[in-house]
Amino acid sequence: MKRLALLGALLVSAMAAPSAIAGPQLGGSMPDKPIDNLTMIYATDPALQCYNTAREGADLKFGLEHCNTAVLDPMMNYRAETFVNRGIIRYDLGDHSGALNDFNNALEYNPALGDAYLNQALVLVAEKRPSEAMAAVNQGIALGATNLQVAYYSRAMIADDAGQYAQAYRDYRQALKIKPDYAPAQRQLERFKVVPKGTATQ
């Protein structure tokens, strides 16, 4: 499980559409200049604050409070994405069980949310449940997770750790095909040597 320990940093935040985080009309889009001679106002919508914390990893407890507020708001759209973001924050706080619950809740609201499956897989890896993690990654890939290079890299790491080197190699290459400058996959591929079938290796 040594290589799999690296996967925790790959959690993928889910951005709600602008209509889900409308916020105040003035400054809600974080303008470059003050509007109508007013002091610049930044969006304080709880769902947006939740997303920003999940993405940036700063002030986790503050972000968690905003996530809690957002998911309790009966008028909020894109609840599934907010559960994903809260799950990431909970994972970063060391609450693996809470993170899994949030990713499961996200999938109840939106069963087609590939990012929820991908994040679920990374928590399952941390919990040393690689078979379940592999199934979740596969589902995330099938549903078109936002960052497919992360999905293929994650699947490669799981296969690599299980000694399934051919599959790992293919998935590292697929991650690079999707994002040619993806450094984690580049580093892992440096470990491989490809030789013709039947060739003796030293």
Residue spans of the language-model regions?
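N-terminal leader/linker segments that initiate helical-solenoid repeat arrays
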Residues: 21-72
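Residue-level recognition of tetratricopeptide repeat
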Residues: 79, 113, 147-148, 182
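TPR alpha-solenoid repeat register
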Residues: 82, 116, 150-151, 185
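Register position in tetratricopeptide repeats
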Residues: 92, 126-127, 161-162, 188-198
